[in-house]
Amino acid sequence: NVHLGSFYHLAFAKKVGETFEESEHHALDRVLMFQGMEGYDDIRPGLTKVAEWDREPQRGSERASGDGGEPRADSENEATFDDFEIETADYGMNFESEDLHVDDIAADSASITEAVVAGERDDQFADAIALNAALRIYAREDVTSIDAGLTAAREAIDDGSAAAVLDDLRAF
């Protein structure tokens, strides 16, 4: 019951949340959208703006290191909308877009991801994959902060459970 996506203007991200709030056909409780480089729906090197919509107000998430203001809602019973920024350097990830360049996005990204979840790579790609996994873990509310999501993502890579999930998806 979580939607992940991307947005170009913050007003659009808010409109997406409002649309799900009014929808009679989609029972989503949470929307996380990213404004990264070139509209990617993931965290890219540098600064990424994140928009967060929750159907249930005041969930009490801490986000990135408990980093900020209160979610905005018009009344106690209405959904909340908030936005915040993620800077990859704040997570000890000092790399540029060029460091993540690949020639064939689909093929290279797949093989790199396989190597990372198999524990065969520990480089900028591994950091980028772990941070993006952290946001997805946070979006599902398995953790209350992005920092905790990053710890969980790295543990899943280290203990092999990330590779097991990838294997299960392949078998599906």
Regions found by a protein language model. Give the residues of each.
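Glycine-rich anion-binding loops and their surrounding alpha/beta cores
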Residues: 1-145, 152-172
